[in-house]
Amino acid sequence: MIDTDGYRPNVGIIICNNNAQVLWAKRFGQHSWQFPQGGIKEGETPEQAMYRELYEEVGLKPEHVKLLATSRHWLRYKLPKRLVRWDSPDPVCIGQKQRWFLLQLISDEQQIEFEACGNPEFDAWRWVTYWYPVRQVVSFKCEVYRCALKEFSAVAFSLMKKSSDKKRNKRPRRASFYKKR
């Protein structure tokens, strides 16, 4: 499904933990890393596509995550000319327009499973600092990543504050080494 401008509708998924770190995934058999993403099928809403792609690419189900935010607008990037398939019988896709989603992982990270659907997109992952992907993603996606991360930054960093507030507000522990003499 390609729009009249040549852009394929797509979803991008940013999964964060309580430390405002984001899941950074390595493309299967390659040296490039990126956020999970994937196309929107005919008749599918962006949110439905996001949950489908989340399971297909990362093995996570809706109950493993909390939806925190959705981008207000479609973010677009053009493919480099060398990646455009000019000889395809389908309409030419010159790039992707993406609706982005910020999710919080609320389950154990052991739930992350790249082979959930038998055809893995990724073969490794790690938690990275929030802005790290902007400097590391392939150059033609850099601006889209910057825009999505910027839009979601207040929400993501509020998680870190809530997490540290919970730690700070725990009942003080008594020192176990103190003994009366």
Curated annotation (Swiss-Prot):
Pfam families: NUDIX (PF00293). GO terms for biological process: mRNA catabolic process. Keywords: Hydrolase. Its EC number is 3.6.1.-. It is an enzyme of class 3 (hydrolase). Gene3D superfamilies: Nucleoside Triphosphate Pyrophosphohydrolase. A motif (Nudix box) lies at residues 38-59. Its cofactor is a divalent metal cation. One of its GO terms (cellular component) is cytoplasm. It comes from the Bacteria. Residues 6-150 form the Nudix hydrolase domain. One of its GO terms (molecular function) is mRNA 5'-diphosphatase activity. PANTHER family: M7GPPPN-MRNA HYDROLASE (PTHR23114:SF17). Belongs to the Nudix hydrolase family. RppH subfamily. Accelerates the degradation of transcripts by removing pyrophosphate from the 5'-end of triphosphorylated RNA, leading to a more labile monophosphorylated state that can stimulate subsequent ribonuclease cleavage. This is RNA pyrophosphohydrolase. It comes from Psychromonas ingrahamii (strain DSM 17664 / CCUG 51855 / 37). The gene is rppH.
